[in-house]
Amino acid sequence: MTITDLVLILFIAALLVYALYDQFIMPRRNGPTLLSIALLRRGRVDSVIFVGLVAILIYNNVTSHGAQMTTWLLSALALMGFYIFWIRTPRIIFKQRGFFFANVWIEYNRIKEMNLSEDGVLVMQLEQRRLLIRVHNIDDLEKIYKLLIENQ
């Protein structure tokens, strides 16, 4: 096993841990989930570049008769990238005392100001940061509003 294979195993393990945390652990942290809303995905250009580069590496490894283990590891990395970028949907998860946004826990008392833009983006101003929440379904904004009013 080469150093390249070890690095690939490390990246695959990191992506797998992230996917498991995002899918199974995060919704169970900090109490019961009150509301979970699907968000719009960001631009997919980065993901296309990543998966494309991994596909080029797979092709290069196969044509140069590289190690079969490396080909399988590159394929697993491409599948993990495909899952994380295209199959998994980003979510905002509301709890009793706060919410998870982009895998970060934010307490409700940190929200200083909230606005709704014309194009349906909920803008939350925190102490030093602005959150732009783009929901998949525009009707979910009303659910978020009701939940925030009930918990304030």
From Swiss-Prot:
Alphabetical list of InterPro entries matching this protein: DUF986
GO cellular component: plasma membrane
Mode of membrane association: Multi-pass membrane protein
Keyword Thylakoid (UniProt): no
Transmembrane parts of this sequence: 6-26, 45-65, 67-87
Disulfide bonds: none
Keyword terms: Cell inner membrane, Cell membrane, Membrane, Transmembrane, Transmembrane helix
Location in the cell: Cell inner membrane
Protein family (similarity comment): Belongs to the UPF0266 family.
HAMAP family, alphabetized: UPF0266 (MF_01071)
Protein name in the entry: UPF0266 membrane protein YobD
Provenance organism: Salmonella paratyphi A (strain AKU_12601)
Gene name linked to the record: yobD
